[in-house]
Regions:
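Bacterial Sec-dependent signal peptides at the C-terminal "C-region" and cleavage site
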Residues: 15-29
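A glycine-rich, often tryptophan-bearing local segment used as a flexible ligand/cofactor-contacting loop or short
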Residues: 210-308
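Extracellular ligand-binding/catalytic regions of CAZymes and related secreted enzymes
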Residues: 28-31, 36-46, 105-154, 173, ...
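Aromatic-Pro/Gly-enriched surface loop or interdomain linker
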Residues: 56-67, 114-195
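Helical hinge/lid and interdomain linker segments adjacent to catalytic or ligand-binding clefts
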Residues: 86-89, 96-98, 157-242, 385-388
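Metallocofactor- and cofactor-centric catalytic cores in central/energy metabolism, strongly enriched
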Residues: 49, 65-72
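Solvent-exposed serine/threonine-rich low-complexity stretches and specific carbohydrate-binding patches
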Residues: 72-87
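Ligand-binding face of N-terminal immunoglobulin V-set domains in extracellular IgSF glycoproteins
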Residues: 40-43, 48-50, 83-114
Length: 409
């Protein structure tokens, strides 16, 4: 009798443990790849997840991670990847649906595959733009050196490490601002970011559609501000279609025969939107040029608050700057302001960088599309948040000062 009672108690203990600690009790399911039915989901809506798993028809645990690799939630279900007649991208059978109401705005991925964004419609101080479509397009270009029709599964891997580095920095240094996330595809819908004070771009945003560019310009012209940390920003024009669960990226006809961007063509300069382009090369530089140094030209500007030196070491390989006219005898770049039309540009700092046996200028610039528009701080350097620069306190200080400056003005 007593032995029977002991086994009953043991069974109850095991039952309580299983109910109390479901996370980790079931074996994690190994995923081959997967995708979701939306790039961006509004907080409180549900998202459908499609997964292809190594072991079929097995019950197990899927783990939800944020983009920084932290486990956020889990769900226990059976992975069944039999094809059926649904019109999603790969005809995977839906694995499960997930309600996002308890998630804060951010970038997430189930089993670290197929990232999606949870977004909020509430007014906020900062909206960070995640380069969903640009990840897809750049992954395809790196593989094939051309753009074909591709789909959402291509976005599962190879997220720009500089974007991850920026988010890690942001998490540790920015506590006082309300923050929202959107996809670059959401730039086609002005209502998704019109209520934010500052847009932040911190990655590779090479590809833009005309509506994305038009809405960005509309946002800046309304008096709102933006921080750009990118050397390839608004360079190539492309189009995309989202049909149910499939995303199609394709070249526009006007750039199908040319590797040169259309936004920087003679008739459609991106200078008028952001003041800078990656394509400004100069073949011969003064002998006193020092690569990997940044020279501050306006040390009284608020973004340099707390900095006492005029020169700082910045590792620079890929950069952008305004249209160059020449370089003076002191090695200071002179810009062709006429190409900016109504744009108002101030050079706050500049540096030289070398890549592919060419040398060119990069810098930090304050740009206004017109006298009544909002402000853009353009840090024209993809390497700003590389693993070396990230360790430098002055890189952190300048970035934080930029965010504060744009939120105050």
């Amino acid at each position: 009798m007593f032995n029977g009672l002991k086994y009953v108690k043991l069974g109850l203990v095991i039952l309580v443990y299983v109910l109390a600690f479901p996370f980790g009790y079931h074996k994690n399911i190994d995923v081959i790849d997967g995708y979701t039915n939306k790039l961006t989901v509004l907080k409180g809506d549900s998202i459908t997840v499609y997964m292809d798993c190594k072991e079929k028809n097995r019950r197990g645990q899927f783990i939800l991670y944020d983009i920084l690799g932290n486990a956020i939630d889990s769900i226990i279900t059976t992975c069944d990847t039999k094809k059926h007649s649904d019109n999603n991208a790969f005809d995977y059978k839906p694995t499960f649906c997930y309600y996002t109401g308890k998630l804060k705005s951010g970038v997430y991925a189930w089993n670290k595959s197929a990232p999606f964004i949870v977004s909020d419609v509430q007014p906020c101080d900062i909206t960070i733009v995640f380069p969903s479509l640009n990840n897809i397009a750049n992954n395809e270009l790196n593989k094939n050196n051309s753009l074909q029709t591709i789909n959402i599964q291509s976005a599962a891997d190879n997220i720009d490490s500089y974007f991850i580095n920026f988010l890690n920095w942001f998490k540790n240094n920015e506590k006082q601002h309300t923050v929202n996330f959107i996809s670059d595809a959401d730039l086609e819908d002005y209502s998704k970011f019109k209520n934010t004070k500052v847009l932040i771009f911190a990655s590779n945003y090479l590809f833009w559609t005309k509506p994305m560019k038009q809405n960005f310009d509309k946002y800046i012209q309304s008096g709102k501000n933006a921080l750009i940390i990118s050397s390839t920003f608004m360079v190539n024009e492309f189009s995309f279609n989202i049909k149910q669960w499939q995303i199609t990226l394709e070249r526009t006809q006007e750039r199908a025969s040319s590797p040169i961007n259309t936004f920087n063509s003679k008739t459609n300069k991106n200078y008028n939107s952001v003041g800078c382009s990656y394509e400004n090369h100069i073949s011969k530089l003064p002998i006193y040029n020092n690569n990997h140094f940044m020279t501050i030209q306006n040390n009284k500007h608020k973004i340099f608050t707390g900095l006492s030196q005029k020169k700082y070491i910045i590792i620079a390989y890929s950069g952008s700057c305004p249209p160059l006219k020449s370089i003076d005898e002191m090695g200071i770049p002179l810009y062709d302001f006429a190409l900016l039309q109504q744009g108002i540009l101030t050079c706050l700092a500049f540096g030289y960088r070398s890549i592919y046996e060419q040398q060119s200028i990069w810098g930090i610039y304050e740009f206004k599309q017109s006298t009544s528009s909002g402000k853009i701080i353009n840090i024209g350097l993809a390497d700003w948040f590389n693993n070396i620069n990230l360790k430098k306190k002055y890189v952190s200080d300048i970035t934080k000062n930029c965010i504060e400056y744009l939120n105050e003005n």
